[in-house]
Amino acid sequence: MSASDASQANMEADVAPAASHAERRALLATCVAAAARAAEVVRAGAERRASLTCESKGRFDFVSDVDRASEAALGDVIRQRHPDATLLAEEGSPDAGATRGLVFVADPLDGTTNFLHGLPWYAVSIAALVDGVPAAGAIINVPTGALFTATAGGGARHAGAPMRVSEIADPARALIATGFPFTREEEIARYVPMLPAVMRATSGIRRAGAAALDLADVACGRYEAFWELRLSPWDIAAGILLIREAGGIVTTLDGAPCPVAVTSCVAGNPSMHRWLIDTLVNREP
């Protein structure tokens, strides 16, 4: 995929939503307030981690009562401010089929396994979509309190300052993030051969266990690029907007605009995004 193709894909996916600047700012305020309330619930849950109830949703995929309480808390904030909006959230939202109008897409605890093991790397992620297009988004790193925000056409910010993707274009200087497809055997077989090609050419690969934070760290220039083969809407909705507004590119593995759906995801600064797709698709057997 050429640089112009990737840029065009990014532009096509980043059409301004049917909302004014003031409306997008209001949606961002809701995202931030809801994420902050959910983060409070998660922090309180961390203090009683040993007594939490935890269930398996599938192969190595877990949910705790903190996930559910966090989702309920953020849902309360959203419904108070936008009673007609739809909530699409990870832990069984009844509105999961809706895509039109105003939809809030939320992961109440991204990095549940990290949380359950006491690893301080997990987040709350919320995006507001207008007719399927991200209009505003917020990600909170719960243990550190770091806040990442963006509005469509209004830029991305971290700790109150504008965010920009890294300018590193040399793979040898690049740090790449990824996520393992651990829940699906067929995806593991597809993914594992990708690692050597990236590992040989870059300064390192990191797998931290929370896709929302990986995307936020691409947006603020800590990582040069990120890829994962299968992500859900709540994993990427806010992160997609952060990266685009920070000057980066987000597509599927085949270079198409990255939808807010179950999808593959390749993200990065323009140079490293192009390099990563070329490397993943054209790697040696």
What are these regions (language model features)?
Residues 98-157, 172:
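DPxDG-like acidic metal-binding loop motif
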Residues 1-109, 278, 285:
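N-terminal subdomain of lithium-sensitive/metallo-dependent phosphomonoesterases centered on the IMPase/IPPase/PAP
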Residues 164-285:
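An extended, acidic
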Residues 55, 96-98, 131, 149, ...:
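Solvent-exposed alpha-helices and their adjacent loops that cap or buttress functional pockets
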Residues 68, 72, 91, 108-111, ...:
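Generic detector of well-ordered alpha-helical packing
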Residues 42-45, 67, 78, 112, ...:
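Residue-level signal for inorganic ion chemistry
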Residues 31, 35-38, 137, 156, ...:
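Small-residue (primarily alanine) positions within well-ordered alpha-helices
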